[in-house]
C-alpha cells in the first residue's frame, strides 16, 4: 500500500514494514474537494490526491497479511467511497528496489476533482473549511509534519503549512 498524505500519519491498519518510496508519474496535490471529512457542502475543503505528472515521495507499507481481512474493507471504503480515486498496482522505488504497491490515484473525471488553483485561494479555502475529521488546516499541517518526520522533503507543502500556521493574512 502506498501512502502520500494522511495514510502516513493515520494509516488505520496493521503493517509489518514501512519504507520510503518514490512514485513516478504522479504528484501530491490538493486537488480534491472535501465536503464531509475536511469541509461541508456549503464550505468545502481541499484534500490530497495523486494527480498526473511528476513524482511523489511517500511510503509503502507491507501489510500484516493475517489481519488484512479485518481492516482492508474499512481502508477500501476510506479511499474509494466517493469514486475520487482509481486503484492501481504501480511500481514504487525504494532503497531496496522497486516494489508493486496498491496506489489510489486521482480520478480526474470525478466531480470533486480540482485543477490548479492560485495559492492564495487554496490558503483561503483551507483556512475556512472544517468537517467530520476537523479543520482542513490541521489536515494539511499534520501531513507536512508527518512528511518531515519521515524524512520526506516537500518544499511546496512546507511553504503552504507555514502560511497556514502564521495566522490570518
Q: Predicted regions: what is each one?
A:
Residues 1-169:
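A glycine-rich, hydrophobic/aromatic-adjacent loop/helix-cap motif
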Amino acid at each position: 500500500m502506498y501512502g502520500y498524505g494522511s495514510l502516513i500519519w493515520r494509516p488505520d491498519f496493521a503493517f509489518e514494514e514501512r519504507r520510503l518510496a518514490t512514485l513516478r508519474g504522479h504528484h501530491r496535490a490538493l486537488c480534491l474537494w472535501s465536503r464531509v471529512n475536511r469541509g461541508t457542502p456549503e464550505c468545502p475543503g481541499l484534500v490530497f490526491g495523486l494527480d498526473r505528472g511528476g513524482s511523489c515521495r511517500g511510503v509503502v507499507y507491507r501489510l500484516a497479511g493475517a489481519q488484512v481481512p479485518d481492516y482492508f474493507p474499512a481502508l477500501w471504503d476510506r479511499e474509494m467511497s466517493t469514486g475520487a480515486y482509481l486503484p492501481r498496482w504501480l511500481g514504487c522505488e525504494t532503497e531496496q528496489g522497486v516494489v508493486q504497491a496498491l496506489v489510489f490515484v486521482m480520478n480526474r473525471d470525478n466531480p470533486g476533482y480540482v485543477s490548479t488553483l492560485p495559492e492564495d485561494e487554496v490558503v483561503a479555502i483551507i483556512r475556512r473549511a472544517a468537517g467530520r475529521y476537523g479543520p482542513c488546516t490541521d489536515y494539511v499541517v499534520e501531513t507536512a509534519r508527518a512528511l518531515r518526520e519521515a524524512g520526506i522533503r516537500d518544499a511546496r507543502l512546507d511553504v503552504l503549512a507555514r502560511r497556514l500556521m502564521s495566522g490570518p493574512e
